[in-house]
């Protein structure tokens, strides 16, 4: 999972560009986490709690839902969770890479640390 963080110096907005297949992770960072250091602290706490357990932790944000397990992290648009029981029509296609991302727990923790270091600099 490759990523790059940028800040627009004109309007102060943050951008998180992720490699193909992980675009939803960038949306989640920018739209649901942003500069919320209290949320980052809670995420680190929950990562430690799920390591080496069968536990799962879920956080529903404004736009995305995050699911932590001992092996992986899933970030998915809230609308997909709401419609997960429904079948979509065959002619309707969702560009999944923008709606859902999956990565390993350790990669996720490293990415969060990078994001936190980035937002603290600006």
UniProtKB/Swiss-Prot annotation:
Name of the molecule in the record: UPF0231 protein VSAL_I2591
Homology family: Belongs to the UPF0231 family.
Top-level taxon of origin: Bacteria
InterPro entries: UPF0231 (IPR008249)
Taxonomic lineage of the native organism: Bacteria, Pseudomonadati, Pseudomonadota, Gammaproteobacteria, Vibrionales
Species annotation: Aliivibrio salmonicida (strain LFI1238) (Vibrio salmonicida (strain LFI1238))
Disulfide-linked positions: none
């Amino acid at each position: 999972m490759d990523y790059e963080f940028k800040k627009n110096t004109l309007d102060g907005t943050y951008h998180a560009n992720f490699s193909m297949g992980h675009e939803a992770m960038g949306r989640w960072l920018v739209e649901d986490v942003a500069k919320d250091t209290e949320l980052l602290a809670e995420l680190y706490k929950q990562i430690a709690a799920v390591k080496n357990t069968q536990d799962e932790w879920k956080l529903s944000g404004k736009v995305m839902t995050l699911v932590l397990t001992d092996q992986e992290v899933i970030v998915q648009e809230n609308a997909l969770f709401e419609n997960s029981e429904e079948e979509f029509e065959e002619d309707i296609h969702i560009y999944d890479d923008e709606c859902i991302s999956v990565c390993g727990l350790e990669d996720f923790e490293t990415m969060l640390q990078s994001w936190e270091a980035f937002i603290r600099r600006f």
